[in-house]
From Swiss-Prot:
The active site is at residue 96. Keywords: Decarboxylase, Lyase, Pyrimidine biosynthesis. It comes from the Bacteria. Pathway: Pyrimidine metabolism; UMP biosynthesis via de novo pathway; UMP from orotate: step 2/2. GO terms for molecular function: orotidine-5'-phosphate decarboxylase activity. It catalyses: orotidine 5'-phosphate + H(+) = UMP + CO2. GO terms for biological process: 'de novo' pyrimidine nucleobase biosynthetic process; 'de novo' UMP biosynthetic process. The keyword Lyase applies. This is Orotidine 5'-phosphate decarboxylase. It comes from Porphyromonas gingivalis (strain ATCC BAA-308 / W83). InterPro entries: Aldolase_TIM, OMPdecase_type-2, OMPdeCOase_dom, RibuloseP-bd_barrel. HAMAP family: OMPdecase_type2. It is an enzyme of class 4 (lyase). Belongs to the OMP decarboxylase family. Type 2 subfamily.
Amino acid sequence: MTTKELFDRICRKRSFLCVGLDTDVKKIPPHLLNEDDPILAFNKAIIDATAEYCVAFKPNMAFYESMGSFGAHSFEKTIEYIRERYPDQFIIADAKRGDIGNTSDMYARSFFEHLKVDALTVSPYMGEDSISPFLSYAGKFTVLLALTSNKGSQDFQMMRDADGEYLFERVIRISQTWDNAGQLMYVVGATQASMLKDIREIVPDAFLLVPGVGAQGGSLEDVAEYGMNAHCGLLVNASRSIIYADNTEGFAAKAAGEAAAMQRQMEIALRAKALI
């Protein structure tokens, strides 16, 4: 998928919503626990309920890895289900990989060749040679952690150098000099919306993956105001506020309602910027 194709889908669905599949077996409705694969059953119901309102899904690998081989199987089957039933959806594997070159090459092969996801979150801490194996895959996107929504982001990401540049700004700026930088996206937390204007001066055209709207308290209005570009350039992720909106047999309908409400807000934002 290209960024143009992604933007076309955003315009068609009047949404830039990404639904995060942070599926915790301890939080899914009790009636699903009798299923052969409760995690997959929950995910299928959430996907079916929200696909109409979103353009992307982001399964978080840690929630599946915590279940061992059973969870890994659920992760793979979830991706297969999205790809088969909703082939227009952009799939982001939230795995936060990144290691020396040959190890990153194996990570890239796993996610882009075997699982066939569209994008993968990656840590840039080890530098260009740890990222280049991911960028070698045409049509696939590498989503670099830039400015995250957690409190600990202050520890390193907000450190300034002698010229006053934040570390996260340096990460973004230098990464734009790498080969195939057009395949980079960046994670910028919604709780850091005040920094989006400055980030857009560094990467006016790149897509930003923005978690933190919903349960974490980030403002969708602020994100759209300061982060949207001429091609939208945003994928706003919501996880808990959608998938755990209800814990009864009506959980999927409630999730659909939450996703629909966010989609309506996003449509207003897109119209305000004259993008649709």
